[in-house]
Amino acid sequence: MENEPNTAQTSLPGALSEASRGSDELLKMAYAKLKDSSLDAALSLLEQALDHDFDNDEIKHALKCVHWWIEHTRRIDDLRNPYEKGAFLISQFKQYFVFLGQLNNAYEQCQYAIRFFVYSKALYFFEGLLSNPANQHDPGLLLLVGRCFKGLGNFDEALKYLEEALRIKREDAELLAEVADVNALLSQTKTAKALFREAFFIDPQKIDLRFMESALILKLRDIVSELGYRNEELLEWIPVYGYLQGVFSVKRELKQVEAGRLKQSIFLI
């Protein structure tokens, strides 16, 4: 008698492939809903995707991230002022970065969708405020609007708002770093180097590297981090190693206090 074919074994790979295709499609749909600011719809699709493919680490990661944002944005409806709503959304990134640091991986597609969700929703709140001429000269609002456009990949529009904010609030390290970052993203490397140098010499502690996106500054951050520096100490050493590595190579005359600080730091290496 001939052996009957093992139908379980022959059908299993096809079934797994079909399930994987189904979960991949649901994951893409979830990311699309996330970009449309539909957190609940994204959550529902991710739960369906997990039913299709329970071992998919990216789906599990995305579920954790969406749950986090649902939990941490509940109180936004209690805020009445559009500026407060938008600023609150962006402020949550600092806690979110800590949360992400506790996870094994940070899947880029997921994080792109999260950033798109936050910045597009925040920008929705801010844009209504910009119709008021008085708000068009508020450097705090202009900074947040510029940061939103940068996060959404519209670098030219980001630069317009950030440069306007910098004209109002000169020698602000946070603003200078943002303008430098956008210039680097626009391949204006010489300008970016000069502005980053300026920002870090003015006040490195005001610069949040977690909001920086350009390879120019992130590579320098990684170099200093690999030397064992962390947190506030890392920020203080970035201008020193930026000078030594030639990243801050665009020349300008250092103020006396800046030159003294730089020499002292180099002697300590």
Language model: regions and residue ranges:
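Start-of-helix register in tetratricopeptide repeats
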Residues: D24-E25, E58, G140-L142, R147, ...
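Helix-turn-helix repeat elements of alpha-solenoid scaffolds
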Residues: K35-A41, E71-H72, G86, C110-F126, ...
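Eukaryotic alpha-helical solenoid repeat scaffolds
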Residues: F99, L103, C110-A134, D138-L142, ...
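Residue-level signature for tetratricopeptide repeat
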Residues: A32-K33, A49, V66, Y112, ...
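Boundary/linker segments of alpha-helical solenoid repeat arrays
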Residues: F54-H61, S91, E171-E178, F201-A215
